[in-house]
Amino acid sequence: MNTKRLRLLTPLLLALALIAALAVPNTASTSPAPPTAPAVTDSQTVAVVPVAYAGTVYLTFDDGPSYTYTPRILAVLRKYGVHAVFFELGQNITWYPSITRSLRYYGNKIGNHTWNHPDLTTLSNYWVTWQLNKMESALGYRPRCVRPPYGATNSRIATIIANRGQRQILWTVDPRDWSRPGTWTIVNRVLYYVRDGSRILLHDGGGDRSQTVAALDLLIPRLRARGFVIGLMAC
């Protein structure tokens, strides 16, 4: 009797066990996956902060044109897309007129630096005027700006220039590149003294200007990195 009852209960117990097993959740398949980092979108990229505007500065070159160095300086200016004022000597223009034309063609300005670089303060009014006119005869027109050689001027010279309808332009930063102190010395002197509105004096003629060429190639990107814009004076 007991054996018969056990045989009847066994299928029922097995069915109940199977139902209980199916009712237990499968944690391996239903647990949430661990969080993953969201994809980076364009709007989440790190923004590059622009350099703050520090001012406008101006490049000027004296004593050219030079057959050797002026074209090399022009190449550096074109490389960076900047322009300068070249205060030229009339006698040099007569030797290398095509170089002066190239400077103007590529957007640079020419200023009057006299015929052959005398100290104008030692000359009479007549000879000051002669020096300026002789340079302009070689150039073919009257530029708007005059730079007296050595920066030597006084009220008399300034009046002569103004009466001609021209502006006297000196400089505010002089790295003394003409003395060939070393490429990095030229660069560092400019960077130390430069301010908003600075007129930087460099030379493309009058001697070996290889250091000036090399310094210019280093100087322009460093001025920009400090927030300076390189402008062009109206000459």
Where are these regions (language model features)?
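CE4/NodB-like, metal-dependent polysaccharide N-deacetylase domain
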Residues: 74, 78-83, 88, 106-109, ...
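Short phosphate-binding/catalytic loops that engage adenosine nucleotides
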Residues: 82, 108, 166, 227-228
